């Protein structure tokens, strides 16, 4: 099965790429745009707090992102309460940004772990108001199931703390989450290099979202290309089906007809 025939579907929308990327931490907007292009990503996330919605047309970040080429995913990065996150999503919608939102409600500044209690509260409100909610959450299958039951269009468990580059720290929880929910599972945060992205996709999840892993690399453009390849390779490997792990060797050549 080729990657071209294998689509990511979120709330009825089809995407060819299973890689989603952020727009922060780049050296320049020009570098960001080039990285987006080579990443092959179709969904681009933007922190609403970083965008001066009143300055459209005056060098605003959104002026550099082609809405015909990318699906914009506004996020609530920097929000620590449900009320703040809901207010941020409402402002984004009023400014003409997408109803498709990445919901973040953080618990503290040191770990940037999600506050699941506030997250669930915000998700309930936003779903009722017609938003398509993609929540950043902990790698807790119970919380992910609750988010699905609320009506979230996907769940986005962390692979490791935001910006840590530690990779997928608890693959077994990610596997359980994938078994538990029917909505897409997108690993968000912690991916540090291409092998991390490939490992995530080999678990059978539906996609990966990253920012620092690309923007923080020594060469963000090259890393964006590497992540593009890694996500596609990991997905294809999952679909192909890996061989089982065994303690002892198995000969790869037939033993029939051996001399002696």
From Swiss-Prot:
Gene: thiG
Subunit-structure text: Homotetramer. Forms heterodimers with either ThiH or ThiS.
UniProt-recorded Gene Ontology molecular function terms: thiazole synthase activity
Name assigned to this protein: Thiazole synthase
Primary enzyme class: transferase
UniProt keywords, alphabetically: Cytoplasm, Schiff base, Thiamine biosynthesis, Transferase
Free-text function comment from the UniProt entry: Catalyzes the rearrangement of 1-deoxy-D-xylulose 5-phosphate (DXP) to produce the thiazole phosphate moiety of thiamine. Sulfur is provided by the thiocarboxylate moiety of the carrier protein ThiS. In vitro, sulfur can be provided by H(2)S.
EC number: 2.8.1.10
Pathway terms, separated by semicolons: Cofactor biosynthesis; thiamine diphosphate biosynthesis
Places the protein is found: Cytoplasm
Similarity comment: family membership: Belongs to the ThiG family.
């Amino acid at each position: 099965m080729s990657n071209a025939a294998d689509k990511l579907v979120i709330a009825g929308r089809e995407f060819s790429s299973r890689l989603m990327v952020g727009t922060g931490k780049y050296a320049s907007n020009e570098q960001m745009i080039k990285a987006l292009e080579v990443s092959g990503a179709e969904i681009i996330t933007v922190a609403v707090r970083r965008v001066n919605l009143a300055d459209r047309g005056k060098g605003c970040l959104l002026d550099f992102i082609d809405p015909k080429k990318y699906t914009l995913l506004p996020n609530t990065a920097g929000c620590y309460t449900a009320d703040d996150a809901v207010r941020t999503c409402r402002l984004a919608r009023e400014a003409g940004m997408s109803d498709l939102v990445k919901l973040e409600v953080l618990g503290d500044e040191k770990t940037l772990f999600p506050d699941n209690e506030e997250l669930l509260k915000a998700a309930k409100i936003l779903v009722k108001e017609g938003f398509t909610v993609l929540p950043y959450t902990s790698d807790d299958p119970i919380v992910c199931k609750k988010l699905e039951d609320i009506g979230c269009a996907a769940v986005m468990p962390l692979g490791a703390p935001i910006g840590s580059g530690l990779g997928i720290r608890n693959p077994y929880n990610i596997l359980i989450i994938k078994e538990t929910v029917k909505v897409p599972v997108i690993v968000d945060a912690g991916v540090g290099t291409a092998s991390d992205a490939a490992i995530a996709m080999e678990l059978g999840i539906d996609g990966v979202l990253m920012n620092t892993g690309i923007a923080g690399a020594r060469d963000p453009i090259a890393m964006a290309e590497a992540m593009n390849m890694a996500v596609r390779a990991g997905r294809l490997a999952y679909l192909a089906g890996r061989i089982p792990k065994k303690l002892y060797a198995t000969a790869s050549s037939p033993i029939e007809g051996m001399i002696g």
